[in-house]
Amino acid sequence: MAGYFTESNYENAVLQLLNEELGYNYIYGPDVERDYHSPLYEDVLLPSLQRINKSLPMDALTEAIYKLKNFETGTLLQKNMVFMDYLQNGVPVKYFDKGEERSTLVYLVDFKNPASNEFTVANQWTFIENSEKRPDVILFVNGLPLVIVELKSPSREETDASAAYRQLRNYMYEIPSMFIYNAVCVMSDLTTSKAGTITSGEDRFMEWKTTDGSYENTQHASFDTFFVGLFEKNR
């Protein structure tokens, strides 16, 4: 099977799976007018926060977005840890209501009702920081780039999932701000698909061999089992 897949074909197969089977909205990066120095999909971010936090005023939402875009100084790992706290527990903000200061949390994701969230898959999403890079595939939830996928050609002997891992590490150096918002990194060459975090060494990236709790009894799970099992919206 791998012999019939070029890297471009494989990328298209992954995009098609996420779009048609899992229901992610598909966008082609160059078609989106945006600031290439921002890793966020800002056209989706504010409407998503409004939808999830219906009772909060715009001042609270704009402060949350400001905090998402302006992290205090620290290492990439420290910033990622702050973001993960925001993602899981909400962004603490203050706003004024009838002259009285109030404190609240702005939630980034609706974990109780997945249908309230907007899931987007993009390719050719340019981001400029230390240099200009375009990761193969990015998965956004409510405009936040939570997943970065690096694919390698399954038909080229000189490239494999390890090459994808090295590319991910290069991205962390060249476009570190993209990884502030990262929850999962994926490296895949069709035969082998593994997921990890920004702190994972290559040996800590793990396969995912189930879509429903029943594991594939094979050395390597098929790529569709991996992506469906890991990125189905209810996960």
Regions found by a protein language model. Give the residues of each.
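ATP-dependent helicase/translocase motor core
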Residues: A2-R235
